Swiss-Prot record:
Family annotation (InterPro entries): deph_CoA_kin_Thcocales, GTP-dep_dephospho-CoA_kin
Role played: Catalyzes the GTP-dependent phosphorylation of the 3'-hydroxyl group of dephosphocoenzyme A to form coenzyme A (CoA).
GO biological process: coenzyme A biosynthetic process
Record keywords, A-Z: Coenzyme A biosynthesis, GTP-binding, Kinase, Nucleotide-binding, Transferase
Family label: Belongs to the GTP-dependent DPCK family.
Top-level taxon in the UniProt lineage: Archaea
GO molecular function annotation: GTP binding; kinase activity
Name under which the protein is recorded: GTP-dependent dephospho-CoA kinase
EC number(s) per entry: 2.7.1.237
Pathway: Cofactor biosynthesis; coenzyme A biosynthesis
One Pfam family hit: DUF359
Amino acid sequence: MRVVFKLPDELRQELKNPLGELIEGNIPEPYVKAKNIIEGDDGVLITVGDVVTENIMRVGLNPNLAIYDHKTERREYKPRIIINGVLLTVKNPPGTITLPLLKSIKKAYSLILNGKSVHIVVNGEEDLATIPAVLYAPLGATVIYGQPKRGIVLIKVTNECKRRCAKIMRRMEVVRDGD
């Protein structure tokens, strides 16, 4: 049976608010600021989004986990991303979090614990992947995702932000085959 977590309309507006620290500015400014914040940090670095992953790599940081979909703002995008690790691909329709996406993110963290870097290329849309990326991340990890027209959002993973993401997941509509 296929299970999908679907974003209900009432959560859509809420998720337009940053889940962490908003770093505003034009490229490359937010990425340079993010680098200064996290440089020297031994924690796991996760990027969500093509533009975010590309620009984090451009300022000299290599994410342990990069999740992207070859799109930006719903348009095709060919990021200049060097895949320097394990490549996983997964299907995930827009506005959803599928079980295969959840399993890929969990698998990625186990690979990271074994010293690997992981890229998850999503066929569909990765916009909601930040939620499970935070949920499954080790405490102290940094998750960075894009905030359209504003900049990037930097999340330091704590128990509190894990609880917030779990609460969001619980509020999503669970759809099973045949529903």
